[in-house]
């Protein structure tokens, strides 16, 4: 046998029900066993709470969407930062290679200049020596 409940309900207990249900269920003389099923969540208590819950759930869903967008943006930003870091490392390596190559080229050009100056000096010395030999041979004879 189910537990016994009060037979007469307050208006607050039945405000969410349809009038015909109330009339049929509460006015008919029923067994005590049937009264067991009359109790349940009432309309006005759940109505505003349900709306508040839906409102809060909508806000939670919006926050979740915003957080997912933010996480996606952070991941994309991280990928872009990785690409930027790779490019900067490549640029740094290229700058170092350019600096080393320019120093090497500068040395090569300096040695080339030294060789040209040495050849010019040797040519001038040979020419001067030939002139001196010609003058000496001319005066001796």
UniProtKB/Swiss-Prot annotation:
Localization per record: Golgi apparatus, trans-Golgi network membrane
Annotated v-SNARE coiled-coil homology domain residues: 52-112
GO BP annotations listed: cellular response to type II interferon; Golgi ribbon formation; Golgi to plasma membrane protein transport; neurotransmitter receptor transport, endosome to postsynaptic membrane; regulation of Golgi to plasma membrane protein transport; regulation of synaptic vesicle endocytosis; SNARE complex assembly; synaptic vesicle to endosome fusion
Alphabetic keyword roster: Coiled coil, Golgi apparatus, Membrane, Phosphoprotein, Transmembrane, Transmembrane helix
Record PTM Phosphoserine, positions in chain: 17, 30
Vesicular-side positions: 140-141
Name listed for the protein in its UniProt record: Vesicle-associated membrane protein 4
Organism, as annotated: Mus musculus
Lineage: Eukaryota, Metazoa, Chordata, Craniata, Vertebrata
Maturation and modification: (Microbial infection) Targeted and hydrolyzed by C.botulinum neurotoxin type X (BoNT/X) which hydrolyzes the 87-Arg-|-Ser-88 bond and probably inhibits neurotransmitter release. It remains unknown whether BoNT/X is ever produced, or what organisms it targets.
Transmembrane segments: 119-139
């Amino acid at each position: 046998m189910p537990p016994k409940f009060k037979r007469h309900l307050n208006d607050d207990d039945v405000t969410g029900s349809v009038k015909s249900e109330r009339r049929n269920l509460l006015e008919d003389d029923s067994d005590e066993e049937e009264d067991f099923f009359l109790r349940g969540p009432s309309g006005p208590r759940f109505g505003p709470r349900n709306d508040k819950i839906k409102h809060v759930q909508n806000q939670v869903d919006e926050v979740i969407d915003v957080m997912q967008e933010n996480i996606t943006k952070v991941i994309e930003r991280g990928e872009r930062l990785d690409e930027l870091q790779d490019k900067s490392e490549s640029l740094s390596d290229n700058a170092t290679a350019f600096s080393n190559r320019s120093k090497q080229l500068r040395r090569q050009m300096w040695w080339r200049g030294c060789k040209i100056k040495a050849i010019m000096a040797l040519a001038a010395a040979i020419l001067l020596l030939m002139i001196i030999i010609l003058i000496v041979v001319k005066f001796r004879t």
